[in-house]
Each structure stands twice: as structure tokens, then as C-alpha cells.
């Protein structure tokens, strides 16, 4: 006897059943609408990339999370994509005649062998939007505006878009006198400020071999607070001797001014110089979005990466963009009950019941006409009592059942039943589609 295979998923992976996919599609469609409203075009890249394409772009800590792949008879070392930015860089390097600026979005799964937890999976979708070939801060501000518009369109009213700049972080390291080889550890510690507090950061810095006087200067800096413009003013006072930090502060001031002109609400944007995006390829402004509840991590994250494409071409090309974590966004929307009531459990709008074998051709013809009129329609596929057919429709969330019995057939009518309210009405068969649509819009 053949051994029974357990239907288990790999750790950190999950199935998305139709009801979940319908909710996901609702969210993704809203995201896509906003992306395209700003003129970003769709792009698709393969799930598998050459390993050498991905390695050396993210940093050692991130690269430990990559999934390697190899065909039994193949020689190429391959890997599942870790994000969508490096594949974009490869595409731009391979198609250097693309008109600039090149504005693209991509909605696709990526894979990371992280420890699974709430809102974090090993296979998850990213919704990326990027602009390549535009060096000015207007491109960065537009990316932030896109994030603002997406979350507003989805119904979020309480969220914060955090802004920082890698140049400011570099300046902090310079002014504090931290050696270059200790900067990655410095950044990781600063990034934990909100979670572990000033005392925890100080302990981490001291344990990371950062000199006491440098730790003291860093502690003074980390106590800077206030509104965005106030924070930038204080940073300019503290970091005035760093030309690089001055550039970063100026870039954030320009972005804030542009966001005002774009109509982005000031209370949704905050400069947070302790925010550190983990990927090493960022070179300028960085941004992420968080919500107060549930504490689920960042919903979006990105920044400017002017040197990434140059790793493929030998010539730097300015680029900026962000990624929306669709899993986390949906998790938050479900926990907050934010999904509209009109997002149904099924794509089917009407079930045409089958009275008996003699009336099956009439039921099939009715279903065909409904589909031609734009109504998603099922015909019940088994010979079962009408009560079983209604039970199926109710269980699967189909909003309307249609009856075509001998009396209806002779009269050229059908009977519609609204399964949520139990209301019934008889209508001429040619008006069935309009009647179904009217009821479906109420569901």
C-alpha cells in the first residue's frame, strides 16, 4: 500500500483560499489603481535569479535568509528573489535604452527564511513602486505621496510615515567618531531605540566596542525630539561639521516642503533619525510606515539607492522607491475590521438552481445569458433537492439564488431569492440580470 502523504506546508508558508484571495485582490486592486494613477507601469521578473545577481547587495545578515535553488542537472547556482529592487536593477542594466525616468511597479511574491510570526511569513507579496533616473527629491516625495494615497484609499486614518536619510546616519557616525567597521552595529542599535529605550541602546553600543566618549555624544543626539522641522534644526546644530549630514538634512527639508505642496497631511509624516532601513544599498532618503495598533512592524519601507544599478553597469544611476507589505496591510485591515462589507466571500453573484433534468437545458441557457450580461453565475452541478442547492449557495456566500421551475418556464419568468434577507421576487427572464445586479449591490 502506498504511503499516505501528510498535506503539510513548509514552515512559514501558507495557502490562500478563495475567500482570502478575494479580500487580497480587493486590496491589491486599490494599490494598483493608485500606482497607475501616478503613471507607474507594470513589470514582471522571474521568481528565480542567478545567485550572483542577488549576493552582495543586501548585507551578510539579509543574505543568510536567502533560499538557494539548483536544478539536478543544471550548473547555474540560482536563488529565489529576496526582494523586487535588485531584479529591477538587473532589468534596467539589461535594457539601458529604457526612457528615463523609468517608473515601474511590481506586485509579486518574495522569499526570506525569517522566523515566522504575526505578520511575517517566509513567502509574502511585495507591492513595489520605483522611479529610476530621477536624481532630485521630487521623485522621493512622489514615492511618499503614493504611500500616503494608497493607505488613505484603503481606509487608514492613523498611520505615520517616518523619514530619515542615510547621509544623516553616516554624519552621526562621523561626528561621534565611530570607526567605519563598527557603523553597521551602530545602525542596528539605533534602530532599536523605540523597542529598548535609551538605556538599552547605550548598553548595546558599549557591548559593541564603541568608545565611551562616542557613546556619550550619541546619547545626546538620540534625545533630540520635536516636530519634523524642529528635529532637523537641532540635528543641523549637532551635526554642522558633517557635510554629508548637512546634505541629508537639506534633502529631508526639501521633501517636507514638496509634501506640503502635494497635500500630504503633516501629521502623517515625521522625521525619525533613529529609523534605519536594514538593506545596505540605500544611499539617501529612507522611509517606512507604521501604525500604533496592532504592533506589527512596518507596513511599507524603502528609500533612495543611487548606486545599486551601477553594480551591474559600472555606472551609477539614481533610483528611489518603496515596498508595501501586502500581508501586513491585510492583517491590520482584518484586525481593525476595515475591509468593506461589499467584499464578498465568493466571486459568484448568482446560483441558477436546477429543478429537474427536463429543465436543465433552460437553466443552462439562463446562466449563459446572465454571464453575457456580466453577472458571475454558477449552475448547480449535481442532481440534488432544491433545499440542498440553497444550502450550498448559503454556505459559499452566493448572494442570490434563481429558480426556474415548470411554472416559471411557462410564464417566461424566473424567481430570485435574496439569501441574506430571504426576500423573493418574480421577474421576466430577460430582466433577471438587472435584478441580480441591483440586489448584489445591496449585499
Question: Model-found features: residue ranges?
Answer:
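Phosphate-rich ligand and nucleic-acid binding surfaces
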Residues: 15, 31, 173-181
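Short, conserved secondary-structure transition motifs
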Residues: 163-176, 191-197
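Positively charged, Gly/Ser-enriched RNA/tRNA-binding surfaces
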Residues: 2, 21-40, 49-52, 75, ...
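Auxiliary tRNA-acceptor-end handling modules of aminoacyl-tRNA synthetases
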Residues: 1-21, 70, 179
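Short low-complexity, flexible loop/linker segments enriched in glycine and/or proline
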Residues: 57-61, 175-177, 394-395, 416-419
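Polyanion/phosphate-binding surface patch
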Residues: 43-78, 120
Amino acid at each position: 500500500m502506498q504511503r499516505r502523504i501528510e498535506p503539510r506546508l513548509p514552515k512559514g508558508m501558507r495557502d490562500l483560499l478563495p475567500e482570502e484571495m478575494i479580500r487580497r485582490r480587493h486590496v491589491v486592486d486599490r494599490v494598483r489603481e493608485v500606482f497607475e494613477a501616478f503613471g507607474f507601469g507594470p513589470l514582471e521578473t522571474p521568481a528565480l535569479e542567478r545567485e550572483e545577481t542577488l549576493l552582495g547587495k543586501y548585507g551578510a545578515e539579509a543574505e543568510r535568509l536567502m533560499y538557494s535553488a539548483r536544478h539536478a542537472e543544471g550548473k547555474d547556482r540560482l536563488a529565489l528573489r529576496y526582494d523586487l529592487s535588485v531584479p529591477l536593477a538587473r532589468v534596467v542594466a539589461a535594457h539601458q535604452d529604457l526612457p528615463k525616468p523609468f517608473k515601474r511597479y511590481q506586485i509579486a511574491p518574495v522569499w526570506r527564511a525569517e522566523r515566522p510570526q504575526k505578520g511575517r511569513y517566509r513567502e509574502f507579496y511585495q507591492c513595489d513602486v520605483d522611479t529610476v533616473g530621477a536624481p532630485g527629491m521630487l521623485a522621493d516625495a512622489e514615492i511618499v505621496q503614493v504611500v500616503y494615497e494608497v493607505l488613505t484609499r484603503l481606509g487608514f486614518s492613523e498611520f505615520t510615515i517616518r523619514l530619515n536619510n542615510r547621509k544623516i546616519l553616516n554624519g552621526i557616525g562621523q561626528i561621534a567618531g565611530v570607526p567605519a567597521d563598527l557603523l553597521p552595529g551602530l545602525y542596528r542599535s539605533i534602530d532599536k531605540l523605540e523597542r529598548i529605550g535609551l538605556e538599552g541602546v547605550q548598553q548595546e553600543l558599549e557591548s559593541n566596542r564603541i568608545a565611551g566618549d562616542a557613546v556619550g555624544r550619541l546619547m545626546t543626539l538620540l534625545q533630540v525630539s520635536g516636530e519634523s522641522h524642529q528635529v532637523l534644526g537641532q540635528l543641523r546644530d549637532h551635526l554642522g561639521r558633517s557635510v554629508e549630514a548637512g546634505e541629508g538634512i537639506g534633502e529631508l527639508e526639501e521633501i517636507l516642503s514638496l509634501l506640503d505642496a502635494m497635500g500630504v497631511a503633516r501629521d502623517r509624516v515625521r522625521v525619525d533619525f533613529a529609523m534605519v532601513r536594514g538593506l545596505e544599498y540605500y544611499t539617501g532618503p529612507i522611509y517606512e510606515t507604521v501604525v500604533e495598533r496592532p504592533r506589527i512592524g512596518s507596513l511599507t519601507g524603502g528609500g533612495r539607492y543611487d548606486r545599486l544599478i551601477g553594480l551591474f553597469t559600472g555606472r551609477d544611476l539614481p533610483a528611489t522607491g518603496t515596498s508595501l507589505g501586502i500581508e501586513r496591510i491585510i492583517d491590520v485591515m482584518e484586525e481593525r475590521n476595515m475591509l468593506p462589507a461589499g467584499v464578498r466571500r465568493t466571486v459568484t453573484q448568482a446560483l441558477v438552481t436546477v429543478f429537474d433534468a427536463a429543465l436543465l437545458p433552460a437553466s443552462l441557457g439562463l446562466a449563459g445569458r446572465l454571464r453575457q450580461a456580466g453577472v458571475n453565475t454558477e449552475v448547480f452541478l449535481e442532481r440534488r433537492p432544491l433545499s440542498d442547492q440553497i444550502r450550498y449557495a448559503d454556505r459559499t456566500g452566493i448572494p442570490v439564488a434563481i429558480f426556474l421551475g415548470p411554472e416559471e418556464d411557462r410564464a417566461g419568468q424566473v424567481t430570485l431569492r435574496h439569501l441574506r434577507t430571504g426576500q423573493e421576487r418574480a421577474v421576466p427572464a430577460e430582466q433577471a440580470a438587472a435584478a441580480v445586479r441591483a440586489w448584489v449591490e445591496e449585499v
